[in-house]
Structures are given as structure tokens and as C-alpha cells.
């Protein structure tokens, strides 16, 4: 009930990202795990890093609270509080705030942003995938103020809807956001972002917008508002290393390599080979290596995407992608 072994991958990544965050500050961090449950994240941060100066773990469930208190007892730096993360009675601000709810993080975001230092990092999980990227359109409008995009792009659109909502919550607090590392994996969305001073209008919009250059979206279909800016900070991502203590070290390492490749091509939405062929009426899809080589030979950047093994991200417009596919198909 209070420990999910399937999320050990994410906790491995948390350890790695926390170390980078502390390295940037050149000091140990003040951390708040807002929905701590058994406190496994806090235990790993305290046990596997030297990045934590002080930690507050809050939990409202009385049964979980007992586990949490026992698990964090060895560390004087850790405080356990029975509090509602939506309305915490906390006076301090934190360098790192983590939200890992069951379902939507939306009710907890205002308090998390309020308690986060300027320049601090907010890490957020959302598991309401049927809302952000599925058929529950009404719930998405109610929770996030956006319409999901019901195409093969739904998962990326869901991630960007979550970021747009985070930008809106931060904006209401007079702050901005800077995404560091954002991804979709299995049944969850995960976002690491930095809280910034406001810097003009955030990159938000509905798709398709005038001049939209990406993969075709069926006529009459609209999605958003969503985040149209980068999903990654390549410099930050390049400093994230697999911790020696990782439970899923090889998987985390391969994932980071894939995200680093993807971060080099900053474009809204990816192409999926089968969808491109279907849209163009091509019977046989070209091999991915030939697609990549053809686009690169024409001067375009191209990279794999973590969102789909048959997907790729490129700075080439749809017209160029379509032209390359037709040429490759004619050569078969």
C-alpha cells in the first residue's frame, strides 16, 4: 500500500537528479517530500547522497505515518509531520519539493510552488494518464484547463498539458518554470523543473496553431493549451549520472542516453514511422536508419524519442519529412 516496487526506476533517477541539483548550489539542500507514504524516496536521498541538509516528510494517512516515522528515525536531519500537503503548516522554504501522488498532482501544486525557493526544483509525478492522454476529456478540462489531443501524439501532448498547468500555477505565484527533464514512462508522467523569476509570456498554446510545422493533426481536432517549449535542459541532463546504488542501473543509463539524444532536437511533437506512411498512402515503411540518414544528408537534425520506439524527432518541417519518405519508398 505504501511502497511501489515498480517505481524503483524513478527513485533511482531521483537520486541522480538530486545530486546534480546540490552540485549546482554547491551546498546541501533543504528538501520536502510532500506525499511521503513510507518515505522510501527520503530514505534513499538520505542514505545514498550527501545532498540533503534537512528534510521534511509529510503524510496524512495515520497508518502510513507509522511506517514513515520508523523509516526516518535514524536521521536527525529528517522531520516527520502529519499534515495535509494541500495546506501545509510550514514556515520554511525548500530547495527541492517532491510530489508523487496517486492520480493527479493538481490539488497539491499551489502549496508546493509556494514553499519552493526561487531557483529550487519541483519534481512531480502524475499517474492520471486517462485524463492527460486518454478519453477523459471533461476531467482534463476540469483538472488542467486543457483538452487532450486524441491522436498518436496523446502522450507527448499530455506531458505538455501538465507542464502548461504547472506554468499557470507558477504564474499565479509570480514565478516562471524552466523544464529540466520531463518524460513519460509506463503508467506515469514525470517532470523535474526549476522555479524561476517571471520572464515574459510562457510558451503556451493550442495546437494546431497558425504556421504549425509539425506532424499533421486531423482536421477539426485541437488540443491544449499545452507547453510548446523545450522538455529538457541539455546541459543539466548531460550532468545526470547513474548512481552506483541504482536498483535498475543499466535501464536508467540507457534511458538517460536516449533522453540526451532527444534533447538535442528541440521540436514540438515527434513523427511515428507508421503514421507518416499511413498519411502518405505508402504501403511499406522505410527502415529507420535510412530515414535518419536521408534527413541528415538533407541538413536536418533527427533523433530517437523516448515516447515511441518507432518515433523520431526532427527539425525538418512536414513537407520535408513527407518528401524524404516518398523518395525512400520509390527506391524500394
Feature names for model-found ranges:
Residues 1-332:
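SAM-dependent transferase fold signal centered on methyltransferase-like domains
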